[in-house]
UniProtKB/Swiss-Prot annotation:
Coiled-coil features, chain-numbered ranges: none
Compartments, record wording: Cytoplasm
Catalysed transformations (reactions): L-glutamate + ATP = L-glutamyl 5-phosphate + ADP
Gene3D superfamilies noted in UniProt: Acetylglutamate kinase-like, PUA domain
SMART domains xref list: PUA
HAMAP family: ProB
Enzyme nomenclature, EC number: 2.7.2.11
Protein name: Glutamate 5-kinase
Amino acid sequence: MNKKRVVIKIGSSSLTNEKGEIDHKKLGDHVNALAMLHQHNFEVILVSSGAVAAGFRNLGYSSRPVTLKGKQASAAIGQGLLIHTYMDKFMEYNIRSAQLLLTRSDFSVQKRYKNATSTMLELLERGVIPIINENDTVAVDELTFGDNDMLSALVSGSIHAAQLIILTDIDGIYDKHPGKYASAMRYDTIDLITNDMIQETDVSGSKLGTGGMKSKLMAAKVAASLGVPVFIGKGVGVSKLLEIVNGHGQGTYVRSFRNKQIPIRKQWISLHSTLEGKVFIDDGATQALMHNGGSLLSAGVINTQGDFEDGDVVEVYNRRNLLGRGQVSCSSEELNAANTLKKAKQMTQIPAIEVIHRDSWVMVDQIKEEFQ
């Protein structure tokens, strides 16, 4: 974890006016705070929505479009306008910034995931602020992050950030809808976001029932599971981000329950990879994987399901339960051939081949099913 590396997510509601257009004063206020954080030697990554809001007027829409083609066309115009505005504002502080547009498929393909992460780290090393947005123009409904909340969580995990700050127009997470219940109490800190808390946001007028909060809770849960603590709330003034990182923010702090962050290879395996098959193992291999810190060898494999190749990701089961998933070092054909040869010759001296290296193995408790 880099103690001075912070991801800040700014949503459309924190950038727009009552007409749904970009509010340049709001954007300028955010840049002022981001610049101050940068000047205090923090590495700053900005995840910003707002492309549609910046562009829809230029297409002749009187209000924010609701059709997919309208949104994507607006984003195509608006993203350029948005990034140009950000760059001009940052240059007032002699701070360079750069644009990265990402989609879910950039995370699902391992090489692209590594390249995106390497690019972000190189920009930070050079003192540049990466400005990240989902590539709305080409994204499809089935493969989106959802208002950039989840994107910010995944970015914070991949670059091993010290904190994720999700800025919103709500001053934190409440036990009830603060607009409907005068007795609503804000959580100053949350140790663990439960699925019950997330589901409650679907119930009108119930616990945490603030619009847009569900996606923020889901994102915070994923970030915390990756070892990144999260702040959800708002702030005022040029020092608002410094106040947040120093523990004095106007909102809710979500603690991470992990003492150390997860390597990016394991993040990709657990959160982004596509499953290509299943491997069933015996009790000895289970002991090696789950308790002894070992790798999975072919000698411990009982059976396989599906056709997979070297580098694919598979689920691993023992005789009773799902144990986890891993990136294989051999194909299903090679694995089955090795075990068939061993059985045919009834020999134990045939060298076992490595199926999953320990560094490419993720136990089931690290796999976030709510994100799949």
